[in-house]
Amino acid sequence: MYIKVLSVTDINNYIKNTMDNDFILNNASIRGEISNFKIHSSGHVYFSMKDQWSKINCVMFRSAAKGLKFLPEDGMKIIANGRISAYVKDGSYQLYCDKLELEGLGELYIAFEKLKNKLEKEGLFKEECKKSLPQYAKKIGVITSETGAAIRDIINVATRRNKNCEILIYPSLVQGTNASSDIIKGIKELNKVKDLDVIILARGGGSIEELWVFNDEELAREIFKSKVPIITGVGHETDFTIADFVSDKRAPTPSAAAEIAIKDLQELNSRLENYKNALNYYVLNNLKEKYNKLDRLKLSMEGNSPERIIINEYNKIDFIINKLNSYIKIEVDKRKEELSRMSILLSSNNPLNILNKGYSVIQDGTGKVINTIKELDKEKKVTINLKDGKKEYQIQ
């Protein structure tokens, strides 16, 4: 038996009043994905929230939308807070939002953008504030984990491009609570090293939480204050951190950072050879022009027999030839001497020269260097590296 016949408006009003007096519906917090997001000319925001099975229409009035800390987009996963009420005219209900929050990593994203905007306004990202990188770095400092893939990648690049380049490694934490202070200390210590050309701050890939240390404000300011130029090679190519924005040069990976810092020795030799060839071409071309000019003079003056003029022209040419030959020899000798001096300097800094002094390097089966007697377990196979070769032994 039905209680009472109601009009459509009456039942819609009843539903609205019921919803407006419901505690849960008046304090709703809903998780879902944004779709059909639109900003009206009035400033009101309209969108839907959906999950795998359902969707709900949402509205956020201009007064509440002004407090948004991010610009919502379709596909974003959010948590919407507000009240659910009915719209009497068409019998629909919707969520009236007071606040929107990004789900999961949203708070980190907001913190990142807030710090980025702050430091950018202070001028820490300006190109004119960035220090120039040395053209030919001979001594490089590296701040990274001593056990991570980043240091292996950097050493491999250094060995391939210029094995005489001196690498100073400052072992540091690169994630976790104390990592930022550890890296800051490393920057300060390496700034004390005499004749240090550049610092590489590196870490392999990881999640946003693992890379979060490189979004630390104190670390960013220390990078900015560094007197030695700093190259960052953090994560993968798609990873960007605050440290990348404030550093003097951002590289997409640790390997790329090493390639920026360490010039290829073969490339330098090739460049020197190109200079030599260009100089030879210039000299030969100049001589050819002089000889052609002389031939023209001889032809034009042949009937008048101006022997003295011709002799003078030949003397001028001989003088030019001698001068150019002398210039070529001086320049080539100078380049050879400079290259020899660089080679001797780089060779003297080669860490492998220590083997020539009677020392040895012991590695386990994986290639890891053994530093303490505790690592020499019985039956363990090791490789002993000496200046004239290496040999495997088994610990008894």
Curated annotation (Swiss-Prot):
It is found in: Cytoplasm. It comes from the Bacteria. Its main location: cytoplasm. Its EC number is 3.1.11.6. InterPro entries: Exonuc_VII_L (IPR003753), Exonuc_VII_lsu_C (IPR020579), OB-fold_nuc-bd_dom (IPR025824). The keyword Ribosomal protein does not apply. It is an enzyme of class 3 (hydrolase). One of its GO terms (cellular component) is cytoplasm. Transmembrane segments: none annotated. GO terms for biological process: DNA catabolic process. It catalyses: Exonucleolytic cleavage in either 5'- to 3'- or 3'- to 5'-direction to yield nucleoside 5'-phosphates. Signal peptide: none annotated. One of its GO terms (molecular function) is nucleic acid binding. Pfam families: Exonuc_VII_L, tRNA_anti_2. Keywords: Cytoplasm, Exonuclease, Hydrolase, Nuclease. Belongs to the XseA family. Bidirectionally degrades single-stranded DNA into large acid-insoluble oligonucleotides, which are then degraded further into small acid-soluble oligonucleotides. Heterooligomer composed of large and small subunits. This is Exodeoxyribonuclease 7 large subunit. It comes from Clostridium tetani (strain Massachusetts / E88). The gene is xseA.
